Amino acid sequence: MKQSQAKKRDNAMTNKILMGLIALVLGLLFLEILIVHSKNEQQKNASNQVQTARIMANGDLLYHDGLYMSALQADGSYDFTENFTYVKPWLKQADLVLGDFEGTINPDYPLSGYPLFNAPQSVTAAIKDAGYDVMDLAHNHILDSGLEGAFTTADALKKVGIDPIGVYEKPVRDKAPLLIKNVNGIKVAILSYAYGYNGLESNLTDKEVADHLSNLDEKRMKSEIQRAEKEADITVIMPQMGVEYRLEPTDEQVKLYHKMIDWGADIIFGGHPHVVEPSEVVKKDGQQKLIIYSMGNFISNQRIETMDGVDSAAWTERGVL
């Protein structure tokens, strides 16, 4: 009788242990399901979050002699902040501001506003204060004060916290990283290219041009744009080409800019004609890509009064932002 009662107690204890183990296993299983569900919900919510970035860009910052005279102070210094008085509030609304500085900044050369462009260092303070983050230097005037002037221009911008593109000193172009800006968690690659350098490239060796400048070599452009497509979320191209003062893009512009879209570009901000040219939305792989063939001038002294003989002179006073 006693053995029977002891056996019953042992069985009851065994059952309790088994039930406890089953409950523990079920509890752990339920906890694991909750953790997995929570992770899935977090991933789902993260994937559903829309990230946005406001990018602003404009046409040429073209500093003619008249702008130097208006910026000259009594002590002989230059203050260019007034140039941006009315647009600064707009620029400050952007998450990323891109510009095109069409000239050079070389302290070893005199100031010049045409046909060669060379501005004082103080111009960069005004540009930075206005809100610019990136400045395109791939244009036909970047050699106006020599290759050294291209380097000093890039350095002047870097000193005030603006990233230059289109000029490479060290490392050289083929070894340089792409400029990719993190904007609200979105990786934005910015590249720029120039159609030529007003013949001043003839003063350089082919190697110097290849190492330090960014021209419209299709093979190299394709490689860099495809690389940007892999490394960034958005790819912005700022090419300089076309015909000055022409209100429509050339066939060459249209063809090349569409190639850039095919290679991976998402946005193309064109420049050089000094007048605004049409924009176009291109559909690729179910997405919309933007082309502005020319953004015109943003700061310059090109206007009706100074553009004798140019039928589209009035349009030099207009630009895109």
How does the language model describe each region?
Residues 2-321:
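Acidic, metal/ion-coordinating pockets
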